[in-house]
Amino acid sequence: PALVERAGAMAVLDGGRLKPVSTYAGFHLLRTLGKRSFVVDTPEGKRKLSPVEWMLDCMFRPELAEQYPVFLVNREEVVRRLHLPDQKDKRKKYSYAQLAERWEEMTRAVREIRLLGETNLTEAQKEILSLARNFDVMRGWMLVSRIMLENPSAMERMEFPRWFPSAGRDGERLWTAAPDKAAGAFLAMASL
């Protein structure tokens, strides 16, 4: 759809670098699931979602996005440590909602792992840290539109990527890393 295409072409400032939303979302989906797309069941049948569609659903339809099985877990030790439901597949996929149910276990595990330091971590410990980081990114996306509506100044204190609209030639909207104080990511997304 045109909306997804336009959203994917917008620029986002992430970690001091300007990149297209499609690249930003694609990187996060690849890091979270190990793929650049995934299939979900809908009332109309199976549907393939792109990284941009996933990110937009997280931001504007979190009740759907939290059910998508996008968190890949490769190690049984991680499943056991976080008390996740077992699955037959070797490469297990969990939803945000399933991980949220185990948030306390995940937080406890992350705290214990961080006390050990960065060196000599097992692959399972590294996977838990990665899982928690990816969970936090998705949680941020799911909260971003609510935060911007309820308390826009909170965005200044948080490390969310930012989209900035600016006027282009003939009044056309362009996207840039040079912020206009009056507009933020929500307004940028809403103007699509």
What are the roles of these predicted feature ranges?
Residues 1-192:
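Soluble extramembrane regions of membrane proteins in the secretory/endomembrane system
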